[in-house]
């Protein structure tokens, strides 16, 4: 074995949320792989980053696939749980309405999201954001109806999706499309799908959902390690475990500060006595 390292770019909130309390004896440290250094068993996270960032992993006989969530909704959910520990799953899911995927897309709300939050397992349907408009083809040319896609579902590669769509159009599996252009720029994504003269835009959009990954399912499972053991958690249990962890972390941090303060007090008392009896000390 040899030293390995992983670099990651953290936002300021992540650096503060992960590492601010690391030096206050808030978490246990263990030997690294060769015993040359100590490393934290866990990080003293101030936010439930497993839910915020999401996570995906696979092992023998198990897997986890946690979608990312909105920071504001998660914090509101934690506050509601602190105020009422007996809050129902339904009320909690009214606060945390669903995953928040960074690449956008639209969630098709259904019983599946409630099932995910109540059981810790479920399948979420995601669609790209689609609009129709008339596009100008140039000076002296007629305008043409087009489908405009401004967001794709989570983890769908734009270039790969356009290439696959072109293959389906060329093979005749999707009809009614005359041209596909990528007009994306710094302001955001814009995929223009020009329609043939007599095409039905609603029918074309329906085929895009059915035959491409413009609509996908995200199979989620909230599997996490609790005291080193994999456990499937529903949303409320996960948030409760996080609150318990924060209580423990804050308690350890407080004892650390108390210990340091008492040590300083002992030194101050010693200096005070020495000052009062300076001749004897000398």
Regions found by a protein language model. Give the residues of each.
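Hydrophobic side chains in well-ordered alpha-helices
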Residues: 74, 161-164, 204-205
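Catalytic phosphate-handling regions of large nucleic-acid enzymes and associated NTPases
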Residues: 1-125, 190-192
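Signal for well-folded cores of large energy- and translation-related assemblies
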Residues: 11-22, 34, 48-52, 79-83, ...
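A generic structural signal for alpha-helix starts
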Residues: 66-69, 156, 160, 199
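Structured alpha-helical segments in the cores of large, soluble enzyme domains
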Residues: 14, 43-51, 124-133, 165-177
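Long hydrophobic segments that form regular secondary structure
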Residues: 131, 135, 139-180
């Amino acid at each position: 074995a040899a030293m390995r390292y992983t670099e990651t770019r953290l936002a300021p909130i992540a650096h503060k949320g992960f590492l601010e309390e690391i030096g206050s004896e808030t978490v246990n440290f263990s030997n690294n792989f060769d015993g040359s250094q100590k490393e934290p068993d866990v990080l003293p996270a101030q936010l439930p980053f497993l839910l915020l960032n999401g996570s995906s992993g696979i092992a023998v006989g198990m897997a986890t696939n946690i979608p990312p969530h909105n920071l504001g909704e998660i914090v509101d959910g934690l506050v509601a749980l602190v105020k009422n520990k007996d809050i129902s799953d339904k009320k909690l899911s009214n606060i945390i309405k669903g995953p928040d995927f960074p690449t956008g897309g639209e969630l098709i709300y259904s019983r599946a999201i409630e099932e995910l939050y109540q059981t810790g397992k479920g399948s979420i349907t995601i669609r790209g954001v689609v609009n129709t408009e008339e596009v100008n083809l140039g000076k002296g040319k007629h305008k043409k109806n087009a489908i405009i896609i401004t967001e794709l579902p989570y983890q769908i590669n734009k270039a790969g999706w356009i290439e696959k769509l072109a293959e389906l159009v060329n093979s005749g599996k999707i009809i009614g499309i005359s041209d596909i252009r990528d007009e994306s720029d710094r302001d955001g994504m814009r995929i223009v799908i020009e329609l043939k003269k007599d095409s039905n835009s609603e029918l074309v959009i329906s085929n895009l959902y059915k035959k491409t990954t413009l609509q996908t399912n995200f199979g989620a499972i909230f599997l996490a390690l609790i005291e080193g053991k994999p456990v499937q958690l529903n949303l409320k249990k996960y948030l409760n475990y996080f609150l318990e962890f924060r209580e423990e972390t804050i308690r350890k941090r407080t004892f650390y500060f108390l210990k340091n303060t008492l040590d300083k007090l002992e030194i101050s008392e010693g200096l005070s006595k020495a000052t009062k009896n300076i001749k004897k000390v000398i």
